[in-house]
Swiss-Prot record:
PROSITE patterns: RECOMBINASE_DNA_BIND. Residues 1-92 bind DNA. Residues 162-249 form a coiled coil. This is Uncharacterized protein YefB. The gene is yefB. It comes from Bacillus subtilis (strain 168).
Amino acid sequence: MYNEGVTSPSQLARKKNATDKWHGSSIRKILENPHYTGTLQQCREYRPSVTSKRRRSVNLENQIIIEKSHEPIIPLEDFLIVQEILITRKRRRPQAEVHLFTNTAVCKDCRRSMHFKKNRKGYVCGSYNKHGLKACSDHYVSEIDLTDKVITNLNKIYLKFSKENYFKELSEKALKYKEKIESKIIEINEKLNDKKRDKSNLVISLANGVISKEDYQLAINITNEDISNFETTLHQLSKDLEFQKIEKEIIDFKKSLDKFMKEGTLTPEMLHLLVDEIEVHANGTIEINYRFREPTVPSA
């Protein structure tokens, strides 16, 4: 129904978080609703309290049921056949099998988690798996390839960590960038304060009749834009400054990496200690974001 462009129930109800996608639970509720057979069935659910948002089901004997209360859309016989089919298809969900990259691998394009497909021995985009090509492409990557790439990358990082003076170089690089960012923050703060003074002077000039309203409006718009740009730059610089505080991050990552090299096995627990996220592109290539970050050049 999503692929055919049929309006979803949430869109029809104009909900704030409405989506164009149909979900299995919505379809099931429609199939199980006797209202379409001409039967009025009321008091099917209730709320335990006025403050509760959760609904609970009411036993059938306590519901109000009025048959042939309105014109049916579907015959009762068809409805009963559907109920029998639903019962035969109903099955207990097996305990969810945890795969190595569950909750770690994500689709680069739609940001949904990758789902493991046993028949393909790999992962596909969650949006594609649930809603098809209209939602996203499959972004398929095999579990073996993904494991090999992660292990290869971890081995490269381990060799880098093993180099003499590597930690010292990282600390010096972080300190260098930190000082550069702090200097830039002081510079931008001075410019921001100058612009705020200019804004105050414009207000005084307008009040004293030194400038016209038109000139004031033109000047104040430019000044406000400059102030906004400086504030945005300061916010980004503050984030960059926080990014340089990596010493503890490096130590924790190194401990986990040493443990992995000693054990030689990539388990889900070990993966989550080392890897923050794996982004899978449409062509199957990957980007690995580790829980360790090298100091980076300031963005501003």
